[in-house]
Amino acid sequence: MVSTTSLQPALRLLVGLLFFSTWFATADVTAQAYPSARSGGNYMHAFYLPPAPTATPWAPAWAPDGQSVAVSMQGSIWEVEVETGVALQLTSGRGYHSSPNFSPDGRWLVYTSDFDNKRIQLEVMNIETGEVFRLTDDDQIYLDPVFSPDGKQIAYVSTQPSGYFNIYIRNFFDGSWVAPPVAVTSDNDFGRSRLYFGAWDMHITPTWVPDGSELLLVSNRDVPLGSGNVLRVPAIENGIEFAETVLSEQSLYRTRPDVSIDGKRFVYSSTSGSADQYNNLYVQPTVGGEPYKMTFFESDAFHPRWSPDGENIAFIGNSEGLSRLMMLETYGGKITHVSINELRHREPMGMVSVKILNSDDNQLTPNRVHLKASDGKFYAPLDAYARAGHVGDLVFHNDGEFEVQVPVGDMEFSVLKGFEFHPMTKSVNVIENEVIHLEVKLERLINMGKRGWHNASTHVHANYGGNLHNTLDNLKFMSRAEGQDLVLEQVANKDNRILDYHLFEGGGGAHSSSEEDQVVVVGQEYRPPFYGHVFMFGMKDHLISPFVTGYEGTAVESLYPSNTDMLLKAKAQGAVTGYVHPFLGEIDPLEGSLGGGKGFVVDAALGATDALEWSDASTSGFYPLYAVWNSGLRITATGGEDSISSLHRSKLIGSFRTYVYTGSAGLSMEAWFDGLLKGRALVTSGPILEMAVGSSLPGDTIEFSDDRGTLNISGRLRSIVDV
């Protein structure tokens, strides 16, 4: 398209035109997960709720005989023989199953069933007959079911009746409830909103003491930071009124206490009050006392469970990246991996083997796969880093070929590779005990690199305390699968923890893991909740510390220093800086509270920030951006989705990104950030808009000798989906 118009003189006219047009071509793909929950939000979904897409073990629970452990895997519950590694599939059918727990007599198995990231229900299976009974069937969330020591009751978490997380006990007999629920806890308002946790208290992860008279649970009642302390609570109606705190520390949903067979101690997962980067296992007296550290990983240990004889602790480790079933010898300390050597399915299965080729050279190419089998569920290869996007899509990346075992019948899958290749969708009829071989060729929409444009998300995190353990190599792999030219990883805090600080290298240049066709930069997200979060890339000497200000109840609660102070310190080291995800929604933040980027306009005026980032398709950021542009300030709009790839639920890497024109300078950190500072950038969540005014490019200044002039504006929009 070509049009001619008369315009007033404008500073960097093309920046505004190109960004504005590209932005409104994006698709606003949003969906509310678990709408019945009125508290918790994204962090609770990622750190606490059962992971739907996991192809590897999660949520271990011992069988009463101590010979096997039930786990959640591939959307079903499996029983794994500890000695042989043989896994028997116990459940199948609708929903994604997790959080298993056996009745003391071994006759019943209770578990959760997740339906399309909207609701989570309780079901129970008769182990002898395989018959399944629905304990709940509504629009609420039910979690953490656990049988009482006598098998006559089940304690669980529910969002009934008001959408907040409370603990209930209910009598159970022969596959069904036999009495109304007893509310051990109830809704309680902290009195004001807490950072990331809101005003309403949560009560989660109950576990019984051996005599059945009390529960240990986790609650943030009267706690300003974190998901809560461990409380000892009578297993009666309103037992929370008699609660005693037995462990007080800042936590993040991972504690999950489990009481020993003698009732004297409990094992739990902890970062030691956020002192450590990773979760390890600890034990402590059930009446309170000092913790004792049991593991010393440079990765995470989650979900510990005592064996029936107390001699071993089953847990989930992620030292190899994916979750694995692990065993800790209680007295002796030996740690072993319970390798799953054989899968025995309930339903007939077949294998699908796929190769994905790049049409440019007919070579294997990394990509992303969305897959649905004949039972309506997602499946992934057993070695895949499977995850859920923030809208609920279940995906895995692969290096250009994969094999996956799925139920017989029609399977459909889609293959995608960033914004510059057309997606492909294929269907196949899977046949029992056969291998179906397929080849998919991805056709290119456009090659922006050949046109001098190179892309990256400006907001990527490798690790953030998630179920998975991420590495720069894996981050690079996923970025290649998404067609990104640069990987801009950010070190960041989560509460008092600092994640990935060991990845930072001084010098101000590209990371040593960079390759000729893929640049890696390790920067920092500085995250004060009041002034707004910012990125800092290219620091020559050290990370900026403290990583946050204004955290209630900590030594950095003060609002000093300001963002201006810290941004200028980063710039003194050569950093490029920008405000990240600062303005959400559609309302002008300049007319209200200034949104999440309260320091942006001031820092733009003071030259402390270079960029303003978009991480979703909201429009509120246009108001402050055009305000600074109209004031003659050279601020560049950037795109970065804030993906956190160690979380099982997070935005997918590269789903919002920045294209920067480097021209003949090619692909390098220096050329890319130099182009960004010059405003030669566009933001997109998919559609690619090329635009020019005459021979001028984004970032150029167009001046007229008189009050009016004529400009030729040309542009072309390309998109892999309809816009």
Residue spans for each PLM region:
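Bacterial N-terminal signal peptides
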Residues: 13-25
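Beta-strand-rich domains and repeat architectures in extracellular enzymes and scaffolds
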Residues: 44-78
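A flexible loop/linker signature enriched in serine peptidases of the S9 family
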Residues: 53-54, 72-78, 92-97, 110-124, ...
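Short coil/turn segments that connect the beta-strands within blades of beta-propeller domains
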Residues: 65-67, 105-107, 150-152, 211-213, ...
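Catalytic cores of extracellular degradative/oxidative enzymes
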Residues: 451-637, 641-648
